[in-house]
A protein has these predicted regions:
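Short amphipathic coiled-coil heptad-repeat segments
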Residues: 149-163
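Nucleic-acid-interacting cores, centered on viral/eukaryotic replication and modification enzymes
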Residues: 144
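Polybasic, glycine- and aromatic-enriched phosphate-binding surface used to engage nucleic acids
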Residues: 1-141, 151
Length: 163
């Protein structure tokens, strides 16, 4: 156990002396030195980018690294994760989401979690069943073969709901 290991105790004490236990993230954990307990997110988004926001569909159910923010879908839309992910891939969604970003040197765009939370989102409940089927079919093709023509087709469908 942790009490039996003097080197671990000394290491934890160094953290206390340095004030690590008072910093925001560690102070929210019990005990403060434990690993962050994070739920598995179905979609990840890169925290920084230069040429388009990177979205990852977490099909493996892995926990994300710190280079990604987690996107959790409200329970009412749990069956629509692939539709939502498809929307995020489109140029129109990228344009809308980029309105809430900070730009750093050399064109690096940085996103904080609240930047993403504040971004406008298409109300996907207005999408017809016919378009949902098209979107899912395109999504399934993208999973197998990432072609820009498929993204153009997705963009056209979603753009029709934003006009």
């Amino acid at each position: 156990s942790i009490e039996d290991c003097e080197t671990i105790k000394a290491y934890i004490n160094e953290g206390i002396v340095a004030g690590v236990n008072k910093k925001h993230l560690p102070s929210c954990r019990t005990p403060w030195y434990s690993m962050e307990q994070k739920a598995v997110a179905p979609i990840w988004v890169s925290s920084a980018c230069r040429n388009g926001i990177k979205f990852v569909r977490n099909l493996a159910g892995a926990k994300s690294l710190t280079t990604f923010h987690s996107v959790f879908v409200h329970g009412d839309f749990a069956d629509d994760v692939d539709v939502i992910f498809s929307y995020f891939l489109t140029p129109i969604a990228q344009t809308i989401i980029r309105e809430n970003r900070k730009e750093l040197g050399n064109g690096l765009e940085k996103f904080q979690p609240n930047d993403l939370n504040a971004a406008n989102m298409l109300n996907i409940s207005v999408i017809t069943e016919d378009d949902r089927t098209k979107i899912i079919n395109i999504y399934n093709e993208i999973v197998l073969d990432n072609r820009s023509a498929l993204l153009d087709e997705l963009n056209t469908i979603f753009l029709s709901y934003l006009q």
